[in-house]
Amino acid sequence: MDSRMEIDFMDLNSKPKLSEMEKQHKKVSGMKWPFSLADLATHHEHTFFQNYKSTPIVSINSKNSSLNNYKSTIDPQYFRGTFPLLAKTSTYDSRKNYDNLSPNESTLTIFYMGEVHIFPGISPEKAELIIDLVSKSTTLHMDEILEKVMNKEKYEENKSDPSNASTNYAKGALAMARRATLARFLEKRKHRLIKARPYLYGENLSKFPFDIQQQEEETASSSVHWEN
């Protein structure tokens, strides 16, 4: 008796319970399903894909009044700020001339100062002639242009660089200083010779002023030794 009570207390003698979904299904239907839930799912998927292949998911028909009414209520100005493809751009206008050109028509394209210039109806021969004319016109006046540029550069260098004028002034001042020092040296030498002459030759002072110029060359060497 005690052993049975313990088994029942541990819930070991009870039968396995059905799931809640099966209980509710039995209560509602009151009958058994002829196939399982997995078969039901596969059958539903098969019918869904058949319907998908036969008819499109969304079909826009102009005869459908509900879609037309919804389309009429949409304002295209509302989407221009968000969708740039709906807004009118200048690229379409700029490509009109290019689209109008025939595929066999040759064009001349010139890139100058960050701009593109297209000239239609110009063959390669005409383009070569234009290039030759431009090259010849530049070579004819190239020498004159170079001379003007060189003269202008020289003038600007002399004008902007004050070092040239300062160097010329410094050279002139140095030459003048050298001449002044040489003149002072010669003058002092002359005075020394005048003072030393009567003592060297024993001549009188009265005769000295008259014959000093005649005997200057003779006394020059002796005065040099005396200075040393």
UniProtKB/Swiss-Prot annotation:
PROSITE patterns: TIFY
Record function comment: Repressor of jasmonate responses.
Short motif Nuclear localization signal, span: 177-184
Family: Belongs to the TIFY/JAZ family.
Residue ranges occupied by any Tify domain in the UniProt entry: 101-136
One family name in Pfam for this protein: tify
Subcellular location: Nucleus
SMART domains assigned to the protein according to its UniProt record, in alphabetical order: TIFY (SM00979)
Gene: JAZ7
Identification of the protein by name: Protein JAZ7
Keywords: Jasmonic acid signaling pathway, Nucleus, Repressor, Transcription, Transcription regulation
Organism: Solanum lycopersicum
Entry GO terms, CC: nucleus
Subunit structure: Interacts with MYC2 (via N-terminus). JAZ7 competes with MED25 for binding to MYC2. Interacts with MTB1 (via N-terminus).
Matches recorded under InterPro entries: CCT_CS, TIFY/JAZ, Tify_dom
